[in-house]
């Protein structure tokens, strides 16, 4: 793979507004469909954004999927209510729009297709004919905006209860509980809600049995320790064999994207921590980088290294929990307690630096909240001396265990084709042999300056391979942390920029103009230029991204949060059919997900 996506690296002005007409895919599209078939939008997303006609959507998608270096992954799909957007110069008239974000692994490039829709004709054809993982994304788009998906195999609510009324991400839908009538749960309403949760196999195209025997339908969750959160999965069983299954999500949904429309650019940062609550600062990274692209902020080198250091600490913390709970799911209890001892050392270090443990909300627009405290280097050095030997003991005592290997090798296995079709990222994708780590191929926050390797599997992603890759990723994160310790730059911890929020405190004590700016930015919030920006990062569980739309206000017009766990849970039925219930437990443990990352 050639790392040629330089518009997303630090060497290029990643926040510059570009139409990407020089991208080869624009020429390929125009050669095939004509020079006037599309409207190309200039954005700060770092990728080509092309408006296509609804009638051409499937044809264009099929063309991109069959190019010599094809766009093989549907990374994201969602919508936007355009009715109140004022800065739309040069764009097709639209009350609503739907976007399709595609990735070409061979090109290391993306493209975003957009379709403009009228309020009186809200419909698009289903993309599931080209990409099976469009299924859940289209269900959520219909649920949140009321955009009909023609030909969809099962267009029902996915995040909200089946009895919910309205489409929450429309601009005329209330964003606060105080704008609704007081909630009442009558006996009749409770019975209605319980009835709505009843699983009817016929609704999902499932048979209740064959001519000779009946199938059994088993509810696993939403309150089950092996479900790793408020997650329900309905199993169609023939004895112990899983004939089919239906994942049921949404129990942890909190409306994170709607919150983004009611919080200032600055005050939304704490909400990012809670998208994937184990990831801490890793979650803050894509959001603040996307906002900095809107603002045109380039942060000092010290900020970049500090952000990388905190991200890798949280990556190790999350991976330790994942590995130990996976071992516990297979049947061994002791490693969990050992892992929590190691995680406590990380929490002590994170708390010393940020003041918090799990949800630090410490990154800022243009920098970090404050400089590193005295003694941070001693704590980090002690941890780096401690952790490598512990990893060796985990691997020797538990992960090389023949029982664990027998329970996990060859279980829930899939190849590169299946991984790409379902939008799998992170270790699940790399286990299939595809070397794709955003830190390497689309470096951000100075990752291009670090020396580390990307662990890759041998061609098949099974439960055991996924776990062992995470172990090696831990070692590489320790390697990155050692470089942070040895090469921490001197300099400021905030950028000298008018939109840095809050601005450097020292100046507020000397200049009344800076004090006024400080007051406005932490109360109303900074005003970001009207534009669109996008940032993806290699998070703890796969690729996490923020796609932000500013309409020149103190708040985001649209905040789209793409999480890896959402895509990974959609893949469950295709990977587990024909396996046993005991295999499902091992598979769920190997995915590495938390439900807040799924449900947002």
From Swiss-Prot:
GO terms for molecular function: NAD binding; NADH dehydrogenase (ubiquinone) activity; NADH:ubiquinone reductase (non-electrogenic) activity; quinone binding. InterPro entries: NADH_DH_suC (IPR010218), NADH_DH_suCD (IPR023062), NADH_Q_OxRdtase_suD (IPR001135), NADH_quin_OxRdtase_su_C/D-like (IPR037232), NADH_UbQ_OxRdtase_30kDa_su (IPR001268), NADH_UbQ_OxRdtase_49kDa_CS (IPR014029), NDH1_su_D/H (IPR022885), NiFe-Hase_large (IPR029014). It catalyses: a quinone + NADH + 5 H(+)(in) = a quinol + NAD(+) + 4 H(+)(out). It comes from the Bacteria. It is an enzyme of class 7 (translocase). The keyword Transport applies. Residues 1-190 are annotated as: NADH dehydrogenase I subunit C. Pfam families: Complex1_30kDa, Complex1_49kDa. Keywords: Cell inner membrane, Cell membrane, Membrane, Multifunctional enzyme, NAD, Quinone, Translocase, Transport, Ubiquinone. GO terms for cellular component: NADH dehydrogenase complex; plasma membrane. It is found in: Cell inner membrane. Residues 214-600 are annotated as: NADH dehydrogenase I subunit D. It is a peripheral membrane protein. Its main location: membrane. Its EC number is 7.1.1.-. Coiled coil: none annotated. NDH-1 is composed of 13 different subunits. Subunits NuoB, CD, E, F, and G constitute the peripheral sector of the complex. HAMAP family: NDH1_NuoCD_1, NDH1_NuoD. NDH-1 shuttles electrons from NADH, via FMN and iron-sulfur (Fe-S) centers, to quinones in the respiratory chain. The immediate electron acceptor for the enzyme in this species is believed to be ubiquinone. Couples the redox reaction to proton translocation (for every two electrons transferred, four hydrogen ions are translocated across the cytoplasmic membrane), and thus conserves the redox energy in a proton gradient. In the N-terminal section; belongs to the complex I 30 kDa subunit family. This is NADH-quinone oxidoreductase subunit C/D.
């Amino acid at each position: 793979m050639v790392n040629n996506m330089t518009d997303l690296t630090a060497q290029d002005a990643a926040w510059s507004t570009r139409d990407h007409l020089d991208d080869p895919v624009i020429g390929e599209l125009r050669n095939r469909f004509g020079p006037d078939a599309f409207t190309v939008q200039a954005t700060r997303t770092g990728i080509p954004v092309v408006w296509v006609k609804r009638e051409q959507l499937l044809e264009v998608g099929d063309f991109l999927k069959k190019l010599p270096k094809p766009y093989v992954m549907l990374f994201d799909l969602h919508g936007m209510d355009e009715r109140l957007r004022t800065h739309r110069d040069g764009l097709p008239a639209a009350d609503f729009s739907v976007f399709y974000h595609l990735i070409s692994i061979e090109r290391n490039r993306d493209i975003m297709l957009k379709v403009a829709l009228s309020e009186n004709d809200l419909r698009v054809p289903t993309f599931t004919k080209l990409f099976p993982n469009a299924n859940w994304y289209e269900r959520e788009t219909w649920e949140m905006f009321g955009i009909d998906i023609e030909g969809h195999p099962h267009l029902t609510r996915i995040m909200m209860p089946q009895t919910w009324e309205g489409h929450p991400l429309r601009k005329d839908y209330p964003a606060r509980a105080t704008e609704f009538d007081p909630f009442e749960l009558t006996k009749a309403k409770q019975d209605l809600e319980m009835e709505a949760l009843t699983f009817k196999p016929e609704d999902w195209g499932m048979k209740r049995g064959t001519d000779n025997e009946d199938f059994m339908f088993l509810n696993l969750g939403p309150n089950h320790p092996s479900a790793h959160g408020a997650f329900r999965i309905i199993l169609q069983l023939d004895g112990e064999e899983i004939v089919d299954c239906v994942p049921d999500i949404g129990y942890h949904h909190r409306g994170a994207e709607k919150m983004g429309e009611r919080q200032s650019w600055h005050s939304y940062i704490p909400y990012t921590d809670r998208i994937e609550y184990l990831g801490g600062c890793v979650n803050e990274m894509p959001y603040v980088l996307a906002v900095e692209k809107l603002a045109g902020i380039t942060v000092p080198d010290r900020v970049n290294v500090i952000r990388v250091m905190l991200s890798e600490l949280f990556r190790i913390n999350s991976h330790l929990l994942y590995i130990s709970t996976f071992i516990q799911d297979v049947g061994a209890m002791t490693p969990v307690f050992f892992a929590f001892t190691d995680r406590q050392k990380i929490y002590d270090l994170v708390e010393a630096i940020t003041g918090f443990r799990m949800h630090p909300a410490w990154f800022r627009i243009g920098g970090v909240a404050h400089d590193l405290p005295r003694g941070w280097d001693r704590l980090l050095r002690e941890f780096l001396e401690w952790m490598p030997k512990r990893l060796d003991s985990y691997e020797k005592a538990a992960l090389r265990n023949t029982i664990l290997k027998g329970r996990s090798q060859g279980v829930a296995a899939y190849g590169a084709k299946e991984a790409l079709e379902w939008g799998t990222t992170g270790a699940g994708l790399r286990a299939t042999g595809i070397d794709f780590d955003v830190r390497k191929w689309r470096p951000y926050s100075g990752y291009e300056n670090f020396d580390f390797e990307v662990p890759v599997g041998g061609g098949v992603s099974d439960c055991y391979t996924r776990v062992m890759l995470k172990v090696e990723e831990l070692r590489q994160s320790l390697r990155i942390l050692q470089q942070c310790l040895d090469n921490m730059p001197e300099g400021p911890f905030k950028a000298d920029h008018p939109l840095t929020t809050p601005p450097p405190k020292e100046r507020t004590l000397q200049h009344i103009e800076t004090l006024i700016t400080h007051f406005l930015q932490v109360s109303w919030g900074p005003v970001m230029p009207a534009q669109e920006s996008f940032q993806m990062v290699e998070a703890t569980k796969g690729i996490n991204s923020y796609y932000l739309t500013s309409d020149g206000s103190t708040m985001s017009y649209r905040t789209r949060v793409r999480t890896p766990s959402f895509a990974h849970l959609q893949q469950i039925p295709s990977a587990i059919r024909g396996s046993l219930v005991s295999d499902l437990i091992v598979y769920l443990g190997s995915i590495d997900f938390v439900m807040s990352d799924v449900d947002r």
